[in-house]
Amino acid sequence: MRSRPCYIPARMLRTLWAALFSVVSTITFSTATIILVFVRAPAHLVERVINIWARSIVWAAGIELKAEGTELLDPNQRYILVANHYSYFDIPCIFAAIPQPIRFLAKVSLFKIPIFGWAIARAGFIPIDRKNRRTAVKSFDMAAQRIRKGNTIVVFPEEGRSRERQMRPFQRGGFLLALKSELPIVPVALNGTYDVFRAGAKTITPGPVTVTVTPPIPTVGRSLKDKESLAQESRNRIGRILFGESFAENDAPTKDEEQKDEG
């Protein structure tokens, strides 16, 4: 009796290829970053390496990346970017699409990954443990230091990747940081990464992703009490881009409905 041929779905092959490529690319560019920081190379070289890494990851996943609204950003101004969070690919898409020296608040476990963790630590990324309030406050202090060194900070105010398309309520930490530093807040919508590789997915589905930058929201002259209204305005802007003008301010899951992945 002849055995049946074993067919591997094309999507699985793409996922395996992207995973292997991403590992090699991440090790290569992480090593380059460590070396550049060690020899005190100009900052723009580090930014260039990060950008090439991000574009290589986007390419390997078969993402057709489109950026909209980046002309709204002043290259001489730094910002607090706030974005929805669906996928591991959100971060490389933001790096590849937005022409700013960006640093993220990243979960502390990423800094424990050999080579990659060393690279992001030396490049000035900021570890945050949201389960520990004291260290979380310290992380926002570190973010303020990065701002003074000329970096734009990206915050995912949902605090984790959502398993559903629906956005969760925005937490206030990033908006307090913007108010204290008096930097403009820029809501950024990531549309498409949920379909490419959402939280809990096993395979990558290549496709289009659009990163939409909205007009900066000034914070100069506003008080810390404005954090609630700023969070709601930012969430509404992103929601209308993702779901249309019918997006409601209270369109958020309850605690019982939330499905959260710590990614």
Whereabouts are the PLM-identified features?
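A transmembrane-helix-recognition feature enriched in membrane-embedded lipid enzymes
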Residues: R4-K66, W118-R122
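Short, flexible loop segments at the rims of nucleotide/cofactor-binding pockets, characterized by
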Residues: I57-A60, L81-V82, R130-R134, R163-R165
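Non-catalytic C-terminal accessory region of glycerolipid acyltransferases
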Residues: R2-P5, P9, V137-G263
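Short, hinge-like loop/turn segments at secondary-structure boundaries
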Residues: N84, A121-A123, T203-P206
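Membrane-embedded segments
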Residues: Y88-K138, M142
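Conserved H-X4-D acyltransferase segment
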Residues: R14-F21, I50-A106
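Short, basic, glycine/proline-bearing loop/turn elements
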Residues: A54, F125-D129, G160
